[in-house]
Regions:
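C-terminal motif of bacterial Sec signal peptides marking the signal peptidase cleavage site
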Residues: 24-25
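Boundary/entry segment of secreted carbohydrate-active catalytic domains
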Residues: 34-84, 287
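Substrate-binding cleft of secreted/luminal carbohydrate-active enzymes
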Residues: 47, 138, 246, 250-314
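Hydrophobic faces of well-ordered beta-strands that scaffold small-molecule active sites
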Residues: 47-51, 76-80, 104-108, 139-143, ...
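Aromatic-lined substrate-binding rim segments of carbohydrate-active enzymes
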Residues: 62-133, 151-181, 226-229, 237-240
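Aromatic- and acid-rich polysaccharide-binding/catalytic face
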Residues: 102, 106-108, 145, 182, ...
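Active-site groove signature of glycoside hydrolases
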Residues: 128-157, 179-187, 217-219, 282-290
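Aromatic-lined carbohydrate-recognition surfaces of secreted/lumenal glycan-active proteins
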Residues: 164-195, 212, 242-255, 280-289
Length: 314
């Protein structure tokens, strides 16, 4: 017969074993969560918001971000921009939490980091490592960010195009969704127009098989110039006839500098844009979404984005 102490110790061991099994099962379930299949038909919109590392300097918590996403009228696509100086594994908790309430677009290489890549292989490895760590929580992969930017991207456009093509081929081989983000600007601000750059440097197979081409544009960087978006997307449709098109970044270049009212007006402008061409699918991906919208309960920008989305759903 077991003594009372032996019975207690045995019960403790059984309890510990049960708790360990529960933890491993839950952890494995989360890690092996099936990848969402957004694969929307051509006429289905993306409603995007962006999270970059700058939010981490605020007092906002991941749970507050999740709560704000859950309060949106649709399941959004959250674009998570990753910094090269941050370990890929460090993003896993954020990706996991966001993917439970939204589609996720990973941006492993922001345009601001492009000069840190000295060869195509190092750029592709960034995507290989990111895919290995985060693919279970990622629905879209941005293979090139502001791909045609001059100056801050470096002075070798063919090299930039080759890096994006390398990342595209890798992600495409995994049968995952590929996204290319181009950069629009006021007339004569760069040597080569966005459209001409894309025609010249993007390989033909990539033009045909990309899933999305989205356009980044900031009025703050372009003297408040307002593009003729109908013409822009007509031109893009001619270059990428089989690809879904939309806006890949918008908002302000400094969230502290501009008034709430100006942000509200800009948010309404973008999130209520019409369907310019057959393959237009929205996007938008407001850059400082966390800083402008979280906590969401009293955020006028959050309300403006949501009300505009609701209008397009009618």
């Amino acid at each position: 017969m077991l003594s009372q102490n032996e019975i207690i110790n045995k019960m403790k061991r059984i309890l510990f074993l049960c708790m360990t099994i529960i933890f491993i099962t839950c952890h494995k379930s989360n890690d092996e969560a099936p990848q969402s299949n957004p694969n929307p038909p051509t006429n289905t919109y993306l409603y995007g918001i962006t999270i970059d590392d700058s939010w981490d300097k605020t007092r906002v918590t991941v749970q507050q971000i999740v709560n704000a996403i859950k309060a949106m009228p649709i399941k959004p696509t959250v674009r998570i921009v990753m910094s090269k100086g941050t370990a890929i594994a460090d993003y896993k908790p954020l990706f996991l939490a966001i993917h439970q309430v939204a589609y996720v677009m990973a941006t492993p290489a922001d345009s601001e980091d492009m000069k840190k890549y000295t060869n195509v292989d190092s750029y592709v490895k960034r995507f290989q490592d990111s895919y290995e760590e985060l693919s279970a929580y990622t629905d879209f992969w941005e293979v090139g960010n502001e791909i045609n930017g001059e100056g801050w991207m470096g002075d070798n456009p063919q090299f930039i195009a080759d890096t994006a093509y390398g990342a595209y081929k890798f992600i495409h081989s995994k049968k995952a969704k590929t996204v290319l983000v181009s950069y629009y600007f006021k007339p004569d601000d760069q040597k080569v127009t966005m459209e001409d750059w894309l025609k010249k440097y993007i390989p033909e197979d990539m033009k045909k098989q990309l899933d999305y081409v989205l356009v980044s544009y900031y009025e703050d960087d372009n003297d408040d110039y307002q593009p003729n978006w109908q013409n822009v997307f007509n031109n893009l449709e001619a270059i990428f006839p089989n690809v879904k098109l939309g806006i890949g970044e918008c908002g302000n270049n400094d969230y502290k500098k501009y008034s709430v009212q100006s942000k509200v007006q800009r948010a309404k402008h973008y999130y209520s844009m019409p369907k310019y061409v057959k393959n237009y699918v929205g996007g938008y991906f407001w850059w400082y979404w966390v800083q402008d919208c979280v906590p969401h309960q009293n955020s006028e920008v959050f309300k403006a984005i949501n009300s505009s989305i609701k209008q397009t759903l009618k």
